[in-house]
């Protein structure tokens, strides 16, 4: 009796790849768990704490408030922007707006802060316009809650816009015709036509954005403005770096871990929902074909598009204009600049290749499980365990991870190497969810396409990978490497804890310039960082899959 197809196609991969994936998952979870335990253990054993219960309550309250309003404003602006974008007939205009707003997805947080300061800050474009019009009364202060909300909307409103716009694209034409025929508008149109197509993605999307805002660090650190606008993550950073108050850090970390784990469990409830609405269907059908444009609608469109211009597009323009100045030549003459860039590039390359390697093993393991239609309980358990190892970093503050590993390894690793190791580990954990999602769908596709052929030809193990899988996935590996390199180059979280004059990265150099109010120098370094990210992305894409760069 011939063996089943599953036995033939899986036996060459299951043993080795699944074991490697399981080992990596155990290592990641154990490392994060031990780092948390070491911080909590050291913290709760300490006797002194600078923060009172009232201080901790205020910090938690502000963290919730800024996260809630950030999600609400991003959702509102994203939804209205998607409706207006879908109303506009010009395909070219749609592509330009989507392209410009999508830059925020890969823009480092420190770079975005520079752009917002150049527009909304004390010497920004809007301040100069107010002065010229004698409107300098009741001036808004960028630093504080307003700046935090502005920065979070800068990053998250384009995400909501893209998702909602894709949802609107799959609304059947008949729905729009019938709505126009029966004069269904306003709230009724939203309830009957739009809501059924966005309700499945909304809880998951809001949960992810809330988690990002709740654990935000770089934006709060640079735009918070003081103790009155401090979140849990920044409070942990302050307690550890400036006061070395491990007890307060442990208490704050416990609250943050508990809240984030609850949110992750909430997300897991909706992870089984169908999210095909996230897939783009290029259908440039417009509501304008079926409803009349009025003066009121035109005013609403103008206001929303103006908000997008002031919050997202104008900061990008101001950053480029201010960064590409004579200051950039002074920075390039400084030898320390090259050392900082080499440090960042070295860490980004190492982190990217480690991340993509781990992602491939994990993706193949998950593909093995998906391809087995008769999954056993142990397969489901392994999949959940691997998913936990990928997503756990979202719940763990980077400062907690760095501090815990420092306490755990300070007797075993020299401090000269410690920042490098922590940066690489945190970058891998940061990039892993994105890299796995990029690679996994292609792994499953190749398994379904080539498994029978490889079984008949006897291609197994590394022979199959070199001959079949790698050539077909070069573009995916290039995309993943480029994205991981960009994310690694722009991360400020861990280096903010361990950065010093002896070891610096590009985000830390930008933060140092901003701390001394040298905004023009910070803008110039930010432009160099953007150029470096772009070159990395193009290099990896061209090197591995030039035919598929656009994909």
Residue ranges of predicted features:
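Glycine-rich helix-loop "coupling/hinge" segments at transmembrane-helix boundaries
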Residues: 218-244, 492-519
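Short helix-to-coil transition segments within interhelical loops
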Residues: 171-198, 369-370, 452-473
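Solenoid-repeat scaffolds in large eukaryotic assemblies
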Residues: 179, 248-249, 454, 521-523
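Short cytosolic juxtamembrane segments of multi-pass membrane proteins
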Residues: 3, 275-289, 369-377, 459, ...
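Flexible interhelical linker loops that connect adjacent transmembrane helices
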Residues: 270-304
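Short, Lys/Arg-rich, polar N-terminal cytosolic tail immediately upstream
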Residues: 1-14
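Membrane-water interface segments at the C-terminal ends of transmembrane alpha-helices
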Residues: 14-45, 54-169, 197-222, 249-268, ...
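Short juxtamembrane loops and helix-capping segments at transmembrane helix boundaries
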Residues: 46-51, 127-139, 230-239, 326-336, ...
């Amino acid at each position: 009796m011939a063996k089943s197809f599953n036995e033939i196609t899986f036996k060459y991969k299951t043993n080795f790849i699944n074991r490697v994936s399981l080992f990596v998952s155990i290592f990641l979870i154990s490392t994060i768990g031990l780092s948390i335990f070491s911080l909590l253990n050291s913290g709760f054993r300490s006797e002194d704490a600078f923060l009172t219960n009232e201080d901790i309550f205020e910090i938690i309250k502000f963290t919730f408030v800024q996260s809630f309003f950030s999600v609400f404003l991003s959702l509102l602006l994203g939804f209205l922007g998607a409706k207006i974008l879908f109303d506009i007939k010009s395909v070219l205009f749609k592509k330009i707006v989507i392209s410009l707003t999508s830059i925020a997805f890969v823009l480092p947080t420190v770079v975005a802060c520079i752009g917002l300061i150049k527009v909304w800050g004390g010497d920004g474009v809007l301040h100069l316009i107010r002065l010229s019009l004698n409107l300098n009364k009741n001036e808004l202060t960028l630093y504080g809650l307003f700046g935090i909300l502005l920065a979070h909307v800068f990053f998250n409103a384009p995400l909501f816009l893209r998702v909602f716009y894709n949802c609107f694209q799959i609304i059947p034409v008949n729905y729009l015709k019938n709505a126009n025929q029966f004069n269904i508008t306003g709230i009724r149109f939203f309830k009957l036509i739009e809501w059924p197509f966005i309700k499945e993605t909304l809880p998951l999307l809001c949960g992810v954005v809330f988690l990002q805002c709740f654990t935000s660090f770089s934006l709060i650190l640079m735009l918070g403005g003081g103790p009155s606008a401090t979140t849990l993550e920044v409070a942990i950073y302050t307690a550890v770096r400036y006061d070395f108050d491990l007890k307060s850090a442990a208490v704050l970390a416990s609250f943050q871990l508990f809240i984030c784990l609850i949110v992750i469990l909430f997300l897991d409830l909706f992870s089984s929902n169908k999210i095909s609405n996230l897939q783009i269907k290029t259908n440039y059908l417009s509501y304008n074909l079926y409803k009349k444009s009025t003066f009121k609608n035109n005013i609403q469109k103008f206001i929303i598009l103006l908000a997008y211009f002031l919050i997202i597009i104008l900061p990008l323009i101001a950053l480029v204009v201010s960064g590409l100045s004579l200051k950039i030549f002074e920075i390039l003459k400084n030898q320390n600049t090259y050392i900082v860039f080499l440090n960042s590039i070295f860490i980004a390359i190492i982190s990217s290749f480690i991340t993509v390697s781990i992602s491939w093993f994990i993706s193949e393991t998950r593909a093995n499980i998906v391809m087995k239609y008769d999954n056993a309980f142990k397969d489901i358990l392994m999949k959940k365990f691997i998913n936990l190892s990928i997503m756990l970093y979202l719940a763990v503050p980077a400062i907690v991870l760095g501090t815990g590993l420092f306490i755990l390894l300070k007797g075993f690793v020299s401090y000269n190497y410690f920042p490098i190791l922590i940066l690489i580990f945190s970058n891998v954990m940061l990039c892993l969810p994105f890299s796995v999602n990029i690679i996994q769908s292609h792994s499953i596709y190749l398994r379904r396409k080539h498994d029978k052929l490889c079984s008949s030809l006897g291609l197994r193990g590394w022979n199959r990978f070199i001959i079949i899988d790698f050539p077909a996935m070069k573009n995916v590996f290039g995309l993943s490497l480029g994205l991981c390199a960009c994310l690694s180059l722009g991360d400020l979280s861990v280096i903010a804890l361990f950065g010093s004059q002896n070891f610096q990265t590009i985000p830390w150099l930008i933060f140092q310039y901003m701390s001394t109010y040298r905004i023009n120098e910070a803008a110039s370094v930010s432009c160099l960082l953007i150029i470096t990210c772009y070159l990395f992305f193009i290099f990896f894409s061209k090197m591995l899959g030039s035919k598929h760069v656009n994909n």
